[in-house]
Amino acid sequence: MPGDQAFGQEEAALFALPPDISRCVAGRITDSERASVLTTLNEIRAAHGVPPVTYDRSSEDETMAAALMMAANGQLSHQPPTNWRCYSVPGAVGAGSSNLAGGMVSPYLAFSTSREYLVGWLTDVRNMMRGTGHRRWLLSPFVTQVAFGRVGGQTADGNRTSAAVLKTFKFASEPPPSGPVPDFVAYPFGDYPQRFYQQGALLSFSPIVDKVNRWNNLKVDLARARVIVSTAGGVVPSRIESRSNLGVGYATALEFSAGSLVAGTPYHVEITGLSYNGEPLNYAYDFTLDNSAGP
């Protein structure tokens, strides 16, 4: 099939030790792939004023085992059943504490770089459950380390498969944030690289009221929240899609839509009606999609 050889070569280049899905061998990614993932993730976090994370190599066995299960079964699950092909306890732990992507077996599957997987988690446009859960883990200032895994290649019957996993919590130890914690995390924010945005992505806002005890941030009341998005031309129609306090990323989140954003246009966002321990909270910030900030 045209392109099969190229797909296999692109997948193979990611590994220092190639995976063998038929034998349930996860393999090992290269040092350069590991470094590239960490660099890209910290580039994304920096665009939001969030401190960088470190890489926990000791957790990579979990993420590689989880990616192996997703690739072998052609599905994604945070709670994989024990009868799955290539099931393992480390893989199940990794699956339950990570962002997941891929998990598809098809002769037509296109190759995705790990950077594309990261941006996919950031935009959350293809999230199977509408919302910004993957994004909130990527951007949480209280996530201070990660581990990555991916497994892919061609199957014996000529199909293609690939899966990626990013562990963000349930580490043996979790150091404090490596830098100042912002007052809020918003998407998009500031002069924002357009390569990190995709039309159709929900906008989001998470207030950080306690920079020490992360769990206190779940007590922010969003019930009366209002969002106003505007440009120099006036108010942009917007709608709150969700008010979430489920603990994802250790913060509440407003998820809202504002139509199709235009690159180069400055947007102003006002968030009002929030409260914490009975005290009102109001926020304002600006963003512009910048298509000149790199590839």
Predicted segment positions?
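N-terminal targeting leaders of exported, membrane, and organelle-targeted proteins
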Residues: 1-73, 144-145, 151-295
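A well-ordered secondary-structure block
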Residues: 85-163
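Surface-exposed loop/turn and secondary-structure junction residues enriched for glycine/proline
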Residues: 53-56, 79, 103, 141-142
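Extracytoplasmic/secretory soluble proteins
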Residues: 14-15, 38, 64, 76-94, ...
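A short linear-motif detector with a strong N-terminal bias
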Residues: 76-77, 124-128, 183-184
